[in-house]
Amino acid sequence: MEQIFSKLKFITHGEGFIDITYDLNLCVEKNNFDSGILNLTSLHTSCSLTINENADPNVLRDLKKYMQSIVPYDSYLTLSKNREEISYKHYQEGADDMPAHIKTSLTNTCLSCLLYTSDAADE
């Protein structure tokens, strides 16, 4: 079994989603993959990976709004009976940094995807 390592870099502009499908497809083509497992890892501590559909832009809009509602920027309400508001202590890297760390903890920093061509699936 052959293993190939490739490193991809993406420029980001703060909170949001980046569709990396095209870049992953180029990497697969460049390395002549036809079947195997594609392991993806984010090396950044406030970035994560998700797999979602790309047909309806409302999916990403809804995901962003939901994440903003459960992980607000400045403070959060405790889940206790009295719903105390707590401010984040970690803010040295910007107001969006602590919420980004929390969102990363709630999602994935690694994904594995089955990769095969229609020819490989027929074997």
Predicted regions and their residues:
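Short amphipathic
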Residues: 2-12
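Preference for bulky hydrophobic residues occupying beta-strand positions
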Residues: 8-10, 40, 49, 104, ...
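Active-site beta-strand/loop microenvironment that shapes enzyme catalytic pockets
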Residues: 16-63
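Helix-adjacent hinge/juxtasegments
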Residues: 50-52, 56-91
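Mid-chain, well-packed structural core segment of small domains
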Residues: 74-115
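Conserved small/polar residues in nucleotide/adenosyl-binding loops
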Residues: 116-121
